[in-house]
């Protein structure tokens, strides 16, 4: 499972489409080395499952004559993989090389000679200088998920030394070279099919990648592959769609991802870059779903605040409100007028939002009487961070500007309301928004993957997550 998850990460090789990615991932040489360390234990267990068929035959041995022999119940008792490597193969995938490997086997022997004499015993076999080399081709299926296969496999068994115990072991020792060769050939024939099956066994696990990850009731994010990987001698760069969609309705936003390149960093195992396009596609999705609206009532204002949502408070700034609607509570509807825009600059994330604020007086019968509509322009700074396997954030207010859209109570000075709406934004809207942002959204993930030693940088038009990885199962 661990090896398949790591190969899956290498395997996120996108389908060939003429679009830019929203998310890029880089797997470095350090990451491949970690994958090799994890994978050897899995391969070692696979090699222990080798089944060597029973071997029998006849051999003329001087001075006895014709001897019938059989070797049976051969079992692998130990496997050693002291030397291995996992290297990049530009344009294909990765190359797995295993050298100086050894097997230890135990089995039973039987002989019959001079027509009537039978004997039996056990034997131990040491297979040394075993080498396996295979290229693991990594492609994508029709759904954008990875598929792996073993190609160009080669296996050799350098030597097989057998030692017989019990009975007429001396007799077997007379023709051990014939037995050695037979066992060596039997093992060598099984190596590459075993490797191919082991690689194919990864594919069901690769299907578990979160190619389409649910965020919440409104949105999901797609991590399908959009282009072939760029494989160099030091890393693999690959491209994911990285686009938010409304659940059940994949509508493209009125903007496209811009091209961007990763900096030459290879200190971590993995780099995940998230473009401004990805975050702006989220803003488009939530705005389209109508999720970027909020009714604000007086009970949402802290009790200690002198500002209350009632016609008395607002009447101090707009006398007509208190005169026409005396002694009534109020309600505000804050709603985005267009998609918020997120920009990334070095060490800086800014969100610009254009909204409307509609103020209502709440009549005794709960009917809402509109008072005015304000245009609200806000700028907030965002702090982005990694939480588990999710990307989360928090915002603080930079500035706001109010203009009058519509008034149902006559003309008034909008600037007189600035202090009220500063409070409303800081103590109600921003905290509610931050609760949602703290939940974050899923990053590309495989199996039981954990990010460690994580650092996040904000660069021009994208942010870069450098991290090491641990697999817990």
From Swiss-Prot:
GO cellular component, one term: extracellular space
Chain intervals for the UniProt region annotation (Central sheet, part 2): 211-275
Function: The cytotoxic action of BPI is limited to many species of Gram-negative bacteria; this specificity may be explained by a strong affinity of the very basic N-terminal half for the negatively charged lipopolysaccharides that are unique to the Gram-negative bacterial outer envelope. Exhibits neutralizing capacity towards P.aeruginosa lipopolysaccharides (LPS) and has bactericidal activity against multiple drug resistant (MDR) P.aeruginosa strains derived from people with cystic fibrosis. Has antibacterial activity against E.coli, but not against S.iniae.
Subcellular location: Secreted
Organism (species): Sebastes schlegelii (Korean rockfish)
Gene: BPI
Disulfide bonds: 153-192
Biotechnology: May serve as an alternative to antibiotics in people with otherwise untreatable multiple drug resistant (MDR) bacterial infections. Can escape recognition by human anti-neutrophil cytoplasmic autoantibodies (ANCA) directed against BPI.
Region (Cleavage sites for elastase): 225-230
Free-text note regarding domains: The N- and C-terminal barrels adopt an identical fold despite having only 13% of conserved residues. The N-terminal region may be exposed to the interior of the granule, whereas the C-terminal portion may be embedded in the membrane. During phagocytosis and degranulation, proteases may be released and activated and cleave BPI at the junction of the N- and C-terminal portions of the molecule, providing controlled release of the N-terminal antibacterial fragment when bacteria are ingested.
Region (N-terminal barrel): 28-209
Listed SMART domains: BPI1, BPI2
This protein's UniProt keywords: Antibiotic, Antimicrobial, Disulfide bond, Glycoprotein, Immunity, Innate immunity, Secreted, Signal
Name of the molecule in the record: Bactericidal permeability-increasing protein
């Amino acid at each position: 499972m661990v090896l398949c998850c790591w190969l899956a990460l290498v395997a996120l090789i996108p389908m060939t489409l003429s679009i830019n990615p929203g998310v890029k991932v880089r797997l470095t040489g350090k990451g491949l080395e970690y994958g090799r360390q994890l994978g050897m234990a899995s391969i070692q267990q696979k090699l222990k499952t080798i089944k060597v068929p029973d071997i029998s035959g006849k051999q003329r041995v001087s001075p006895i004559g014709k001897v019938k022999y059989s070797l049976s119940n051969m079992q692998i008792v130990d496997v050693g993989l002291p030397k291995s490597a996992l290297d990049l193969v530009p344009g294909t995938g990765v190359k797995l090389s295993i050298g100086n490997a050894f097997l230890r086997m135990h089995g039973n022997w039987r002989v019959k000679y001079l027509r009537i004499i039978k004997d039996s015993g056990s034997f131990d076999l040491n297979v040394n200088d075993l080498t396996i080399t295979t290229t693991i081709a990594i492609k994508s299926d029709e759904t954008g998920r990875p598929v792996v296969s073993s190609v160009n496999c080669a296996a050799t068994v350098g030597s097989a030394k057998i030692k017989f115990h019990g009975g007429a072991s001396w007799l077997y020792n007379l023709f051990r070279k014939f037995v050695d060769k037979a066992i060596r050939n039997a093992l060598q024939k099984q190596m590459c099919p075993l490797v191919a099956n082991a690689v194919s066994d990864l594919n069901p696990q690769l299907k578990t990648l979160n190619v389409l990850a649910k965020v919440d009731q409104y949105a999901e994010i797609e991590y399908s592959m959009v282009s072939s990987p760029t494989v160099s001698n030091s890393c693999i760069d690959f491209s994911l769609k990285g686009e938010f969609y409304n659940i059940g309705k994949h509508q493209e936003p009125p903007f496209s991802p811009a091209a961007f390149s990763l900096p030459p960093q290879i200190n971590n195992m993995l780099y995940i870059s998230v473009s401004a396009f990805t975050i702006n596609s989220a803003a488009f999705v939530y705005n389209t779903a109508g999720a970027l609206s909020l009714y604000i009532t007086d009970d949402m204002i802290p009790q200690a605040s002198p500002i209350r949502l009632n016609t008395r408070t607002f009447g101090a700034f707009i006398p007509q409100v208190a005169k026409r609607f005396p002694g009534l509570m109020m309600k505000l509807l804050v709603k985005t007028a267009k998609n918020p825009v997120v920009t990334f600059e070095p060490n800086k994330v800014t969100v610009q939002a254009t909204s409307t604020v509609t103020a209502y007086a709440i009549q005794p019968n709960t009917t809402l009487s509109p008072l005015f509509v304000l245009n609200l322009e806000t700028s907030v700074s965002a702090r982005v961070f990694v939480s588990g396997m999710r990307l989360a954030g928090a915002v603080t207010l930079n500035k706001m500007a109010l203009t009058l859209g519509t008034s149902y109570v006559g003309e008034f000075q909008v600037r007189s309301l600035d202090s009220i709406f500063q409070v409303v934004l800081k103590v109600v809207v921003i905290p509610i928004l931050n609760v949602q942002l703290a939940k974050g959204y899923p990053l590309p993930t495989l199996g039981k993957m954990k990010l460690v030693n994580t650092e996040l940088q904000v660069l021009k038009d994208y942010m870069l997550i450098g991290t090491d990885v641990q697999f817990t199962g």
